[in-house]
């Protein structure tokens, strides 16, 4: 998860608006490791937490994004799909044997994750074909 997470952050930084938001509103310059840890905790909670924990956390994140004007659906989708792409790609490159149907299932299951951060389900890819077009 660590390698996939770092890859996701690097891919997310390729979007000028995402990087602009991070530069303007994140403390990553002063506390890079702390910021990385908090991001890891966020992903871990959404992956392994209870529904109550995930809803509480994502509600907080949505409120922060809204307050800062960082709730653009296109941008949120970019960040989400960079994470999905990174975790899947890292797993495959590490030698995990994941059938195409299982890859599609993972991408489809991540729609719930996207909805929790405020992305409309209809906007989120549910398979490899959709993943390739974001």
Where are these regions (language model features)?
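Mature, function-bearing regions of proteins
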Residues: 1-131
């Amino acid at each position: 998860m660590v390698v996939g997470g770092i890859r996701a952050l690097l891919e997310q930084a390729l979007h000028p608006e995402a990087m602009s938001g991070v530069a303007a509103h994140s403390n990553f310059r002063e506390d890079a490791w702390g910021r990385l840890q908090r991001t890891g905790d966020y992903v871990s909670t959404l992956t392994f937490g209870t529904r109550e924990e995930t809803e509480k956390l994502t509600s907080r994140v949505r409120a922060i994004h809204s307050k800062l004007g960082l709730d653009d659906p296109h941008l949120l989708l970019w960040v989400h799909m960079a994470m999905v792409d990174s975790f899947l790609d890292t797993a495959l490159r590490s030698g995990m044997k994941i059938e195409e149907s299982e890859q599609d299932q993972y991408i489809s299951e991540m729609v719930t994750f996207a909805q929790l951060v405020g992305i409309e389900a209809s906007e989120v890819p549910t398979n490899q074909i959709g993943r390739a077009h974001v």
